């Protein structure tokens, strides 16, 4: 390199020397001083300025030895005086060229040297150099700055905007694009992680000269390691890390004097060596603040300047050590600095969101670098679905859970495929189940059973191992009694797990997760997200529509919530939404948790909940009354999840307690469930028939009659029966029996009734009918909304059960012969589990608050609830590493010593002694106690190891682009060796092998090998783990040489150290050598070739010739792109000149083909290096990728072609032939091509309509393309047909059989109507036909008017017999109706008649006008009884049937009504009596007739008139009753009977009749008596007839 230096004379100890001005200004820069210009400054003869030697030429060879504390170098310049440059090199240059050693000082005698090729050397005698205060004097600060220039064409780009002096690229939606490069012409513009344009045209190369200063040599000589012996280094497994310290040869005591180090004088490695220039600069800047130097260095600072600055920092460090008399502060400072560097923190471990703890690491099975951590096993994902390494053909493949689980769940993941580990798991299982015997020498304190945690995340071999132990130790396969005494359960979420366990013998019991999901979505979700109720019957391991089985197919336990299900998820959501939006996963602080629970607990008390579950009492009603599964009650549903143990009851406590107590007393027998639409919603019913009655028809015994339960519930708060009736068939055993309410929802919550008397007092007692039906009427079932219920709930039980009735069944000791251990029979159904803890309960503040103490004091309460199996919290002393929620809240699932059950100290739940007392107390009352077996993971161990790891997802699949790829990583995987693991690990294997030898010979499925007891694991280490979580230590925490990828190691056989630690001066960094840019290794100082180098956060590649490459490159089969400054594109989308997008990962490699994951469930797809955008067909499936290339999942997308599609939430495929709803509640139907249909569509049997945007029309009118109007149902969306409908404006329409609104004249159900062209019905208006005829349609009914006059808008029309109008202008001899509907008359002269009198009409008929009104109907005028038609015309010579139904006759001449005479009309003779009404004239036998007064009379079968009283049969054999000569009609009381006679006097029998009061009554088919207070099935419907005999129509069927 060329150098341009200016020299100046300085007086040093009375001798003049020449010093490079560049060197002086450099050190001045380091010191932050300000002095005059170097080439004009005058130095006095007496100046005592310190000599700051660097690449200098001295004019006096006898210059005294000078000690310095900083290095001075010169700035590179384009023009140079070659002679000066050469002169400045002097002996420093020659020293740099030496191959045998490095000179410690340029003006002293040669010291002992070290051959650079030798691996070891020994320390030499110390040279006690003295640094004076003068040597640290202030100097001049010279700084230069280079401004970035913005290309003119960049500023012209329409997408680029300038903001605050920086340029940003905006996408089509106005969002700033980050980590983005775009090709424009022949140029590439790069926008960094902030989105700002970054000039990448210049290489950031060091401008320093290659000469080495005396000070550099001095520091190198003294900072070298005391020796290469490992004892002089703080290493992990002999590997050096960023936190490593070492013993240097000398320390700069008090920052002044080099003094030989003692064995205790360790210093941070980073004080003397750095892996790259960027880290070195960051170190200097960071430590400057620590030691009080006010100076900041930038990327423009030269290596020489940084070296000088680092030396000054070292001097200040030593000064502070002298002052503080310790290095504690320095260790804290260095550790803190390390965490700021991306290669040593989580930045280089990204992505963060593919694992519960941000990310996973898989340990390499084979690695020469870490042979002690190797394994022959680590068979990942060997779940029940994939136990052999291939998918089990017995089970259903689920694309969303392909392996039925995954391996890397949390923390240090135990390798449960390792036979040695499998033996240790058996050892630990035995210890747990025999804890009382082993720890307290008291078998009564042993656990009875286990819960197996996280089954889908461990090797399924453990299920065989634990099952075989339970069979061997307890004989659970021998009989039900043994099995029920040791019911062990598993936490296994895959649908394949239960059939797997069943095929294996049902030795362990799994959860009914399907039923949990049914409760969640049918009941617990907010109203707008709830499903129907039908899944509660069918979506379960047990179909309960009719369950009359003695034994279910598979055993199971059921729950609504658990310690880690629907609790911590809700707390996470609250924290994310309301406390810390940057929170990720389950990494919370205790303070955040405390804040979240304040919101959570208040939300639980609200009617309209935002986070917590709705309808908890409804869920528990089903859990605790269902047949065929053991219910598990969760502690947090009865007591608050937070707070002291059992201190605070929830709002649902009373309801759950009531159900628990009722379960023991009533819940037994077969079960039937129904779900149907009724009223304005749907209901769910459930009936248990009682002990001894499996079927509805079973009569059972006395206990059957006093047991059983009926449930009615709904999930709609606005529910109403709307007059309908619900009938529960309680079973034949319960006919004609009283039932009473146990629990009823009210407007305020849930009311519970503990006794028959309580319910009776509340009026909540019902009686079944003779068929065992219990009926619920309109007022019984109403939806409510309160903090407990959003819907309705009623639970009913038989009256009369004894207070101490207990219907539970004991297990049989009869030998089991079906090859199964657990049987879900009545005895198993009698059990109730209690998950007796919450993750979030508070830490005890005093002894009596410890969980296990409280449990022991409350055993009687658990007994009163009917608890049979008490599931204890995991009793392990918790890790406190705070890496995951479990170790923050210390719930027992995060531990480092599995055998420490509160022996070393109290855990969250108490001490080991308190645990013993709790177990014994539970046992004393007959309860079984369950331990939590957690074989999946272990947390931060106290000792560290270096392990070869690869960054993977939770399945162990490598993460594309990760910097951690077969890399060394420091893990917390080694236990102390002096804990309870050391005491009990493997301790029981020999005993177990002797007692149960079959356990040690059975070959396990995943390995094909038996468990291996030969090695007793006394100390955990990495070789027993599959992997771990990322720990935030970064990709390069274990230090290495970038060029060679060799790790720094201090072992004898792998010794590799930076030459700096061997006393040599190393010049590193990117430099220009006159031909191109090269890189010198910070470790060896040598020029690198064929190597990737990370410098200043950028990735470079130096080719086979050692020169930096640019542009597109294919290196060892992978494609990269290097910008003009040599930096590779990383984590960047690059849009090329053709507009195609490419993605370069964290390792700089271009993603080539297939899917690549970005975040938890964010995917991109690539083909031949091109990133998919928009609609893309992948393997025959249409998928969509947004403008950033991210795959659409669970999204409705309007694609570029304007069509609407929905992409599946799991696989992202376009969904076909399916309905989907968006977040606003709009529905779409995706056709066979995946496109949302539009317009009129027939889907199944429904006729639907979809808008142009694909949204389904519901509850609205649609004008279709044919111009016709249609209406679609508000709920189903189905098209209405053959019905009237009113719009919001009050207009009526009629929708025809094709659904279209009819137009024009229509006859509908006998009515002549008219509809406008837009479908609106005409009412109260005239219509003119095309032929000019006018018609009028009534204002109320809309019916066409005939034979009447109507005034419309002041004009009078008369509408004749054909309904058409005749002009009425002063009509002569005509009647008409005025605007008020009053009939008026114009006389034959055309004059309006306003007075009174008789008038002849134009038809020569007569009308009578009274005060201007034309009379109609029966009238008395003078002495005449006359009758007028509706048009006012008098009736003459005609019969008239009056409104009373009676027949009258008016004389043909006078019009007088006929009285007491016979008249023949139309050939038929009538007799009109004294009242003027007609009577039949003969004396018929067995017939009724009306006399002249209208009184109904009767002639008996002999033809004799009946004048007395009594029952008589008529000619048709029907009965009637005559009282004092009159035939009775209507509702009558005869004797003690309430009977009914029709208008002809005929008695009603076996029929329902609507009586004169409008009510329907039913009369017995035999006696004819009116029935009361009972149900009757009539005409296909049920009616309930009350105490007055009146029916309440309910329509239940």
From Swiss-Prot:
Q: Sorted alphabetically, which Pfam families does this protein's record hold?
A: Choline_bind_1, Choline_bind_3, Glyco_hydro_70, KxYKxGKxW_sig
Q: Where is this region: Catalytic?
A: 200-1050
**Region Glucan-binding: start and end of each range?**
1099-1597
User: Which InterPro entries does UniProt cross-reference here?
Assistant: Cell_wall/Cho-bd_repeat, Glucan-bd_rpt, Glyco_hydro70cat, Glycoside_hydrolase_SF, KxYKxGKxW
Give the source's domain of life in one word: Bacteria
| Iron-sulfur keyword on record | no
What PROSITE patterns does the entry give?
CW
What biological function has been recorded for the protein in this entry? Production of extracellular glucans, that are thought to play a key role in the development of the dental plaque because of their ability to adhere to smooth surfaces and mediate the aggregation of bacterial cells and food debris.
What other facts are recorded? GTF-I synthesizes water-insoluble glucans (alpha 1,3-linked glucose and some 1,6 linkages), GTF-S synthesizes water-soluble glucans (alpha 1,6-glucose). GTF-SI synthesizes both forms of glucans.
Name of this chain's protein: Glucosyltransferase-I
- Give the lineage: Bacteria, Bacillati, Bacillota, Bacilli, Lactobacillales
């Amino acid at each position: 390199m060329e150098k341009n230096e200016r020299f100046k004379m300085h007086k040093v100890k009375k001798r003049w020397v020449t010093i490079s001005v560049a060197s002086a200004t450099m050190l001045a820069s380091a010191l932050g001083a300000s002095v005059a210009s170097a080439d004009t400054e005058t130095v006095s003869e007496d100046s005592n300025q310190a000599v700051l030697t660097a690449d200098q030429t001295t004019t006096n060879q006898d210059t005294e030895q000078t000690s310095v504390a900083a290095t001075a170098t010169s700035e590179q310049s384009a023009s140079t005086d070659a002679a000066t440059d050469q002169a400045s090199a002097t002996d420093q240059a020659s020293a740099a060229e030496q191959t045998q050693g490095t000179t410690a000082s340029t003006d002293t005698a040669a010291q002992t040297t070290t051959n650079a090729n030798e691996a070891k050397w020994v320390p030499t005698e110390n040279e006690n150099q003295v640094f004076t205060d003068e040597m640290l004097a202030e100097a001049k600060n010279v700084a230069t700055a280079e401004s970035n220039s913005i290309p003119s064409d960049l500023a012209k780009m329409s997408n680029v905007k300038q903001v605050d002096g920086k340029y940003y690229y905006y996408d089509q939606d106005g969002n700033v694009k980050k980590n983005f490069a775009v090709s424009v012409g022949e140029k590439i513009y790069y926008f960094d992680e902030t989105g700002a344009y970054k000039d990448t045209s210049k290489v950031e190369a060091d401008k320093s000269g290659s000469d080495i200063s005396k000070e550099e040599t001095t520091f190198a000589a003294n900072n070298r390691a005391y020796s290469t012996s490992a004892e002089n280094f703080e290493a992990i497994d002999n590997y050096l890390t960023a936190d490593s310290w070492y013993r240097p040869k000398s320390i700069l005591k008090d920052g002044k004097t080099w003094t030989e180090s003692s064995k205790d004088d360790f210093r941070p490695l980073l004080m003397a060596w750095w892996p790259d220039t960027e880290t070195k600069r960051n170190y200097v800047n960071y430590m400057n603040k620590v030691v009080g130097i006010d100076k900041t260095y930038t990327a423009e600072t030269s290596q020489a300047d940084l070296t000088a600055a680092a030396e000054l920092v070292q001097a200040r460090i030593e000064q502070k050590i002298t002052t503080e008399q310790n290095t504690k502060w320095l260790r804290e400072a260095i550790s803190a600095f390390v965490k700021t560097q991306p290669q040593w923190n989580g930045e280089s471990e990204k992505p963060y969101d593919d694992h519960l703890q941000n990310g996973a690491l898989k340990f390499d099975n084979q690695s020469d670098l870490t042979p002690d951590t190797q394994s022959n096993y680590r068979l990942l994902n060997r779940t029940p679905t994939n136990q052999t390494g291939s998918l089990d053909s017995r089970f259903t493949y689920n694309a969303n859970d392909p392996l039925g689980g995954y391996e890397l769940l949390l923390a240090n993941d135990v390798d449960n495929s390792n036979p040695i580990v499998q033996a240790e798991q058996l050892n630990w299982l035995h210890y747990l189940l025999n804890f009382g015997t082993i720890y307290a020498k008291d078998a009564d304190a042993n656990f009875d059973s286990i819960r197996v945690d996280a089954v889908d995340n461990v090797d399924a071999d453990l299920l065989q191992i634990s099952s075989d132990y339970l069979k061997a130790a307890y004989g659970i396969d021998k009989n039900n009694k043994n099995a029920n005494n040791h019911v062990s359960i598993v936490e296994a979420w895959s649908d394949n797990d239960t059939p797997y366990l069943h095929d294996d013998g049902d030795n362990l019991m799994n959860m009914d997760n399907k039923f949990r999901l049914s409760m969640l979505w049918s009941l617990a979700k907010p109203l707008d997200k709830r499903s129907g109720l039908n899944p509660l019957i069918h979506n379960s391991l047990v179909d309960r529509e009719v369950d009359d089985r003695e034994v279910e197919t598979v055993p199971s336990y059921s729950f609504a919530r658990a310690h880690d299900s629907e609790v911590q998820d809700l707390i996470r959501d609250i924290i994310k939404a309301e406390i810390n939006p940057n929170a990720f996963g389950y990494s919370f602080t205790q303070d955040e948790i405390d804040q979240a629970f304040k919101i959570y607990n208040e939300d639980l008390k609200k009617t309209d909940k935002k986070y917590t579950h709705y309808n908890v009492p409804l869920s528990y009603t089903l859990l605790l009354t269902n047949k065929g599964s053991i219910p598990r009650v969760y502690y947090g549903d009865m007591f608050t999840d937070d707070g002291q143990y059992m201190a605070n009851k929830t709002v649902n406590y009373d309801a759950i307690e009531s159900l628990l107590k009722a379960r023991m007393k009533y819940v037994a027998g077969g079960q039937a469930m129904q779900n149907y639409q009724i009223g304005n919603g749907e209901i769910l019913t459930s009936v248990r028939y009682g002990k001894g009655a499996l079927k509805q028809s079973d009569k059972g015994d006395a206990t059957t009659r006093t047991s059983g339960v009926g449930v009615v519930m709904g999930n709609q708060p606005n529910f109403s029966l709307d007059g309908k009736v619900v009938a529960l068939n309680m079973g034949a055993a319960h006919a004609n029996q009283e039932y009473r309410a146990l629990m009823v929802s009210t407007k305020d919550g849930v009311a519970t009734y503990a006794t028959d008397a309580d319910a009776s007092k509340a009026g909540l007692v019902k009686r079944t009918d003779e068929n065992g039906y219990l009926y619920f009427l309109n007022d019984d079932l109403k939806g409510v909304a309160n903090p407990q219920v959003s819907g309705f709930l009623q639970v009913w039980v038989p009256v009369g059960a004894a207070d101490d009735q207990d219907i539970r069944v004991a297990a049989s000791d009869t030998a089991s012969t079906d090859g199964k251990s657990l049987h879900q029979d009545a005895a198993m159904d009698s059990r109730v589990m209690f998950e007796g803890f919450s993750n979030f309960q508070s830490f005890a503040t005093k002894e009596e608050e410890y969980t296990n103490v409280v449990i022991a004091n409350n055993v009687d309460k658990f007994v009163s609830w009917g608890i049979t199996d008490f599931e204890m919290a995991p009793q392990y002393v918790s890790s406190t590493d705070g890496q995951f929620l479990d170790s923050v809240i210390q719930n027992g699932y995060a531990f480092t010593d599995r055998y420490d059950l509160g022996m070393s100290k109290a855990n969250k739940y108490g001490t080991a002694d308190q645990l013993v007392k709790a177990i014994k107390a539970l046992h004393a009352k007959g309860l079984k106690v369950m331990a939590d077996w957690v074989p999946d993971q272990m947390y931060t161990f106290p000792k560290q190891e270096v392990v070869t790891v690869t960054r993977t997802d939770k399945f162990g699949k490598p993460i594309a682009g990760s910097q951690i790829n077969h890399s060394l990583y420091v893990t917390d995987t080694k236990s102390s060796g002096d804990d309870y693991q050391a005491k009990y690990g493997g301790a029981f294997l020999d005993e177990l092998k002797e007692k149960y030898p079959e356990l040690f010979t059975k070959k396990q499925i995943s390995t094909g090998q038996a468990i291996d007891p030969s090695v007793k694991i006394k100390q955990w280490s990495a070789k027993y783990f599959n992997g771990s979580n990322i720990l935030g230590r970064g990709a390069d925490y274990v230090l290495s040489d970038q060029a060679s990828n060799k790790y720094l190691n201090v072992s004898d056989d792998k010794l590799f150290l930076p030459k700096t630690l061997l006393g040599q001066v190393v010049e590193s960094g990117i430099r220009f050598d006159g031909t191109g840019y090269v890189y010198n290794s910070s470790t060896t100082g040598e020029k690198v070739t064929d190597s990737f180098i990370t410098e200043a956060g950028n990735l470079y590649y130096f080719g086979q010739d050692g020169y930096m490459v640019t542009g597109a490159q294919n290196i060892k089969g992978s494609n990269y792109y290097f910008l003009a400054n040599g930096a590779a594109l990383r984590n960047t989308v690059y849009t090329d000149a053709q507009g195609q997008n490419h993605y370069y990962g964290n390792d700089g490699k271009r993603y080539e083909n297939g899917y690549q994951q970005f975040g938890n469930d964010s995917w991109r797809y690539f083909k031949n290096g091109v990133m998919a955008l928009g609609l893309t067909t992948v393997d025959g499936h249409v998928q969509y990728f947004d403008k950033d290339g991210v795959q659409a999942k669970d999204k409705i997308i309007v694609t570029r072609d304007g069509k609407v599609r929905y992409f599946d939430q799991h696989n992202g495929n376009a969904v076909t032939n399916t309905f989907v709803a968006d977040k606003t509640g709009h529905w779409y139907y995706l056709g066979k091509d995946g496109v949302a249909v539009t317009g009129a569509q027939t889907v199944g049997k429904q006729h639907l309509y979809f808008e142009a945007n694909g949204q389904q029309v519901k509850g609205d009118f649609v004008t279709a393309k044919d111009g016709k109007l249609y209406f679609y149902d508000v709920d189903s969306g189905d098209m209405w047909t053959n019905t009237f409908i009113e719009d919001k404006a009050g207009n009526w329409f009629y929708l025809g059989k094709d659904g279209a609104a009819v137009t024009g004249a229509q006859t509908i159900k006998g009515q002549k109507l008219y509809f406008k062209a837009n479908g609106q019905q005409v009412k109260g208006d005239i219509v003119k036909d095309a032929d000019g005829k006018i018609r009028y349609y009534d204002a109320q009914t809309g019916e066409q008017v005939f034979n009447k006059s109507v005034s419309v808008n002041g004009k009078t029309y008369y509408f004749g017999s054909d309904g058409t109008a005749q002009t009425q202008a002063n009509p002569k001899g005509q009647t008409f109706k005025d605007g008020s509907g009053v009939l008026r008359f114009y006389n034959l002269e055309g004059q309006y008649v306003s007075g009174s009198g008789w008038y002849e009409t134009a038809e020569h008929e007569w009308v009578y006008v009274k005060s201007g009104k034309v009379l109609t109907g029966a009238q008395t005028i003078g002495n005449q009884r006359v009758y007028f038609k509706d048009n006012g015309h008098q009736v003459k010579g005609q019969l008239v049937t009056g409104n009373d139904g009676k027949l009258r006759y008016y004389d043909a001449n006078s019009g007088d009504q006929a009285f007491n005479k016979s008249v023949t009309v139309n050939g038929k003779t009538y007799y009109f009596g004294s009242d003027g009404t007609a009577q039949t004239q003969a004396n018929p036998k067995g017939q009724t007739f009306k006399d002249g007064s209208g009184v109904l009379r009767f002639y008996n079968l002999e033809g004799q008139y009946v004048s007395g009283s009594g029952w008589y049969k008529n000619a048709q054999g029907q009965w009637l009753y005559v009282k004092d000569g009159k035939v009775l009609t209507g509702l009558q009381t005869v004797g003690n009977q309430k009977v009914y006679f029709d208008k002809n006097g005929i008695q009603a029998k076996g029929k329902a009749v609507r009586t004169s009061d409008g009510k329907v009554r039913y009369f017995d088919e035999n006696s004819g008596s009116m029935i009361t207070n009972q149900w009757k099935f009539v005409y296909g419907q049920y009616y309930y007839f009350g105490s007055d005999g009146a029916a309440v129509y309910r329509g239940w069927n």
